[in-house]
Amino acid sequence: EIIGILKDANLYWLEEPIWPPENYKGLSKLRKNGITIASGENACTSYQFEEMISNEAADILQPSVTKVGGISEIIKIALLKKNNFRVVPHSPYFGPGFMATLQVIGALTPDSEIERLYVELKADLYNGTSNIDSKGNISIPNGTGLGMEPNLEIIEKYSIK
């Protein structure tokens, strides 16, 4: 009954709609109803993404750089993509996890989407490097490491002493 309602809603995607999230057979069954499924924010290794792909459990793979163990593992996951699966990193972060996700996207798929929480921050730790422009784009910082240096004055101001 709910499948028809969801299809009529013309969702961009339905994210991790089944519990537990590693129920890849259940996700595959739901996906066959024509609903775009995004999954992977709770997966921790490339092996789980391989299983997700082999079960055709999602249209959109959403690895989280901090949950999968960093940049190397998320690159392995992004390189697994095949059969028209999209990779849209899950990034509900405001700090180094977000910057690491931007670097991965820039290295592998610069035209990729990124899932990001949007809130107006009281202070900008990264001097505007994580700001979204009027077209919804984010510039990828090109400095060393994660591409930027944090604003030390902001760190000092908001540090708990």
Predicted regions and their residues:
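Catalytic core of soluble alpha/beta enzymes
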Residues: 1-92
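Flexible C-terminal active-site loop/helix
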Residues: 92-161
